[in-house]
Amino acid sequence: MNKALYSTKLGKYYIAKCEDFIKHSKLQGKVQLILTSPPFPLNKKKKYGNFCGEEYKSWFVSLAPLFESLLTDDGSIVIEMGNSWEKGRPIQSLLHLKSLMEFVENKDANLRLCQEFICYNPARLPSPAEWVTVKKIRAIDSFTHIWWMSKNDYPKANNQRILRPYSKSMQKLLSSGKYNAGARPSEHKISEKSFLKENKGSISHNVLELSSINGDDLRLPYSMLSIANTKSNDFYTRTCKKRGFTPHPARMPLELASFFIDFLTDEGDIVFDPFGGSNTTGFCA
């Protein structure tokens, strides 16, 4: 029987092997969103525990039917996974892509890929160090894949809850009510009123950017959602330091978790993270 490490009125945190927890839980068919960042398919063993190579893929793919069993009919699974490299070679491995593809195509789970997101972190340390900083023959590996999956083609989702603030040029356009209408080289025809409706923001794109930005800056230019990557003095880090604990080395950004929770759930829905770590998902939910 699963026993919670701690609980609040809004949720519970368990220490358990996720496979065993799911098999003995009472959450089947009740979870609206599974949001998680599992151990990445790395070449080296980490302190927090991880599989490597084919062993990793087999383990990860086996989780698909377990996760699917927890979902409501319109529920979603969102998984963040980093890139992997061949050991001792300056080439990328296909392990992470094969793992994700075989996960969603697992015949024992009824899943499909709704959309892929990219999470770009320009402040990430140069890696793989051997090929980027020592031999200088590769560029910095600075993004992770985020796959949004579900049991049907129309899971619960509302992009009006993840609107980005308008750019200055769009604010100016709305204020003046003027822009160049008519035909474009792409053969699209823009009417005289197409861009004049006030929607309280622009629809988010599927490229998310982590960046050390001023807290007063709502967004960077162009089409990316900017997430401030300033964790060195946040509540979690300060609390760990105060209590003598080592902070989790690979935390999901709060804003990233909030983005998908806002996008794919309503208040009162159940959100589950099978690899809780520092409990970012629980905190945001």
Language-model regions, residue ranges each:
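Core catalytic lobe of class I
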Residues: M1-A285
